[in-house]
Amino acid sequence: MGFGEKWSEWWRSFLGFSQDKSRKAVDVLRQRYIEEMQQADRFKGHAEKMHYPQFNEKLHAIANEKGRHAEQIAEKLVALGCKLPAVPENTSSNENSWRQLLNALDEEYRSADDLVDQLRGILSDRPDITELLQQISQEQKKHRDEIREMLMRSDPFALSLS
């Protein structure tokens, strides 16, 4: 790419007129795919280590929903002619059940914040992708509420200290 092409692309992006508007949407989908796959794996791990049997089923359900999100995103990527990105493995932790739930809640909040920013970036460019990501955002809110409920049931006092 020559200097003139780089300069004109810079101006297009600076003014919000990207040469390839779907490229941003694809980048968002790739990032969300990796994140949903990692979260599905993480929630499965939390469920397997959970000392509270009543929470085990709920964590497995969240993991399955995360896996379904990843499948939906994968379908969009394939439909756009893209290869699925490699998903780095999660590292295992030896934290207690309560700390795992708290970390899961923090992760859901961080992910939700990222998703809001990503949606702003592609809102008008790709309504089909925006709709999928908004659906995922709604389910993330439900997950946060469920995790918060589990935390309060496991140790209500500890949640007020965090």
Regions found by a protein language model. Name each.
Residues 1-162:
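Iron-associated oxidoreductase/ferritin-like identity signal
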